[in-house]
């Protein structure tokens, strides 16, 4: 044994015990695959500080971060999903609802709140993608209409964050009717000259993108969000052509004039506040 080995052996303590690291301390980025400290990721609204990849964020977390603290009042909690057709595929619809409610701790795929943003009154809604793909049911449509009505009542702007796969197939034509219902409600908002800002997040597809998602006075998207009606694979199979790189991503849509802005999630609150102050002719302080 040489002198280095003697020093090392004296200072190293061997143990057979495994170190216990609590679950949830680290999160792997879906973009760069780096391990991130979960608390830091949460502070950055689920945006990777290394590669700026926008990871999934819950609807409730999004809204609570968007509105001023202490100003929040939730709306539409009494509007719940119903198994109108006793639908069953591989699983009963009512069982899917129970599973989704347990998974997300939410009663439906749309959460509506009223409050203030930099002291400006606003009504805001957000889709919860983990609740059956953020799909639009009759209850989601009713919650959305209630949000619009509250905006009309308060004479304030309305903001909606979309993240959805489209209409909820388990409710058949009733879910498709929500496209017309929500669009008609937004037409009233437009007639009253009240601003509606639509924020399209990853993904916003199907009936949601074809109705309320694209009807904003200003349509904003998060970076690299997938936005469209049918998915790219379905389109490729239909037209039998290879689609352009980045097709249906927010950057592609901005280039084609489909959306107005791309805004990073950490910058969204201030950007929307600036837009609302101009649209409503209100001043606000960033402090």
Swiss-Prot record:
GO cellular component labels: acetate CoA-transferase complex
Enzyme class: transferase
Enzyme Commission identifier(s): 2.1.3.15
Functional pathway: Lipid metabolism; malonyl-CoA biosynthesis; malonyl-CoA from acetyl-CoA: step 1/1
Binding annotation for Zn(2+): 29, 32, 48, 51
ZnF region ranges: C4-type: 29-51
Reaction catalyzed: N(6)-carboxybiotinyl-L-lysyl-[protein] + acetyl-CoA = N(6)-biotinyl-L-lysyl-[protein] + malonyl-CoA
InterPro entries cross-referenced by the UniProt entry: AcCoA_carboxyl_beta, Acetyl_CoA_COase_Trfase_b_su, ClpP/crotonase-like_dom_sf, COA_CT_N, Znf-ACC
Main location: cytoplasm
Domain CoA carboxyltransferase N-terminal as annotated: residue spans: 25-287
Complex formation: Acetyl-CoA carboxylase is a heterohexamer composed of biotin carboxyl carrier protein (AccB), biotin carboxylase (AccC) and two subunits each of ACCase subunit alpha (AccA) and ACCase subunit beta (AccD).
Cofactor binding, note field: Binds 1 zinc ion per subunit.
PROSITE patterns: COA_CT_NTER
Family: Belongs to the AccD/PCCB family.
GO biological process, one term: malonyl-CoA biosynthetic process
MF (Gene Ontology): acetyl-CoA carboxylase activity; ATP binding; carboxyl- or carbamoyltransferase activity; zinc ion binding
Keyword line: ATP-binding, Cytoplasm, Fatty acid biosynthesis, Fatty acid metabolism, Lipid biosynthesis, Lipid metabolism, Metal-binding, Nucleotide-binding, Transferase, Zinc, Zinc-finger
Biological role stated in the UniProt entry: Component of the acetyl coenzyme A carboxylase (ACC) complex. Biotin carboxylase (BC) catalyzes the carboxylation of biotin on its carrier protein (BCCP) and then the CO(2) group is transferred by the transcarboxylase to acetyl-CoA to form malonyl-CoA.
Cellular localisation: Cytoplasm
Biological classification of the source: Bacteria, Pseudomonadati, Pseudomonadota, Gammaproteobacteria, Enterobacterales
Cofactor dependence: Zn(2+)
Protein name: Acetyl-coenzyme A carboxylase carboxyl transferase subunit beta
